[in-house]
Amino acid sequence: MPQLNTSTWTLTISLMIISLFCIYQLKMMNQTLIQITPSTEQSKLTKHTLPWEKKWTKIYLPHSSHQQF
């Protein structure tokens, strides 16, 4: 039964850990976890228009009791 050659495993695992660390650091550079100085643009409240606000909707009154003639 042939033996498994594990001589390159150390190098492979080391490079994998280093590359994962680098990828993680690059991803975290783009994230803002704590905002130190608030920007004025974000402090302004913007009104979001919803699709149903653009349309005219009919508002019905509740049903009245039966009218007797």
Curated annotation (Swiss-Prot):
The modification N6-succinyllysine is found at residue 55. The modification N6-acetyllysine is found at residues 55, 58. It holds the Pfam family ATP-synt_8. PANTHER family: ATP SYNTHASE PROTEIN 8. GO terms for biological process: proton motive force-driven ATP synthesis. The gene is MT-ATP8. It is a single-pass membrane protein. F-type ATPases have 2 components, CF(1) - the catalytic core - and CF(0) - the membrane proton channel. Component of an ATP synthase complex composed of ATP5PB, ATP5MC1, ATP5F1E, ATP5PD, ATP5ME, ATP5PF, ATP5MF, MT-ATP6, MT-ATP8, ATP5F1A, ATP5F1B, ATP5F1D, ATP5F1C, ATP5PO, ATP5MG, ATP5MK and ATP5MJ. Interacts with PRICKLE3. The chain crosses the membrane at residues 8-24. It is found in: Mitochondrion membrane. GO terms for cellular component: mitochondrial membrane; proton-transporting ATP synthase complex. Belongs to the ATPase protein 8 family. The keyword Membrane applies. Mitochondrial membrane ATP synthase (F(1)F(0) ATP synthase or Complex V) produces ATP from ADP in the presence of a proton gradient across the membrane which is generated by electron transport complexes of the respiratory chain. F-type ATPases consist of two structural domains, F(1) - containing the extramembraneous catalytic core and F(0) - containing the membrane proton channel, linked together by a central stalk and a peripheral stalk. During catalysis, ATP synthesis in the catalytic domain of F(1) is coupled via a rotary mechanism of the central stalk subunits to proton translocation. One of its GO terms (molecular function) is proton transmembrane transporter activity. Keywords: Acetylation, ATP synthesis, CF(0), Hydrogen ion transport, Ion transport, Membrane, Mitochondrion, Transmembrane, Transmembrane helix, Transport. This is ATP synthase protein 8. InterPro entries: ATP8_mammal (IPR039017), ATP8_metazoa (IPR001421).
